[in-house]
Design a protein with these regions (language model features):
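Conserved acidic carboxylate
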Residues: 8
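Two-component/phosphorelay signaling modules centered on CheY-like receiver
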Residues: 11-30
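Conserved phosphotransfer microenvironments
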Residues: 14, 35, 48-69, 80-82
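Acidic, metal-coordinating helix/loop segments flanking the phosphotransfer/catalytic sites
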Residues: 31-49
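Alpha4 helix (beta4-alpha4-beta5 surface) of REC/receiver domains from two-component response regulators
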Residues: 63, 78-96, 105
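A short helix->loop->beta-strand "cap" motif at the edges of active sites that frequently abuts
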Residues: 70-75
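C-terminal output helix
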Residues: 98-111
């Protein structure tokens, strides 16, 4: 089962993104504020996508990417300056402010 895990340090932001994804018919496995919580959710699904911000409460997005199994992809939502130098393998980026249309299209592409 492919799961989507939403991870942002601000719980309200994470919940708003989850609500947007659920309204679009996507299966959201979990919403959390730390990388450790995201890894716990990741253990419960076969593969998935982590939708996250640049800096979580307990680690940076790059640390979380290192800890996740290869069967997970990551969608980083951050300002362009945060990822100008390039992104690690398995990480896609969307710039803030984010548009719902761009988020949905990117996730649909990642799910195929």
């Amino acid at each position: 089962m492919v799961g989507i895990i939403v991870v942002f340090p601000n719980k309200d932001n994470a919940t708003n993104i989850r609500n947007l994804l659920v309204r679009a018919g996507l299966n959201v496995t979990g919403v959390c504020t730390t990388g450790a919580q995201a890894m716990n959710y990741a253990d419960s699904v076969d593969e998935g996508i982590i939708v996250c911000g640049y800096k979580l409460k307990d680690m940076m997005y790059s640390e979380l990417r290192e800890y996740l199994p290869d069967r997970f992809e990551m969608l980083l939502i951050a300002s362009q300056g945060k990822w100008e130098e390039g992104l690690a393998s398995g990480v896609m980026g969307l710039t803030m402010p984010i548009k719902a249309y761009d988020l949905m299209n990117t996730l649909q592409m990642m799910l195929q």
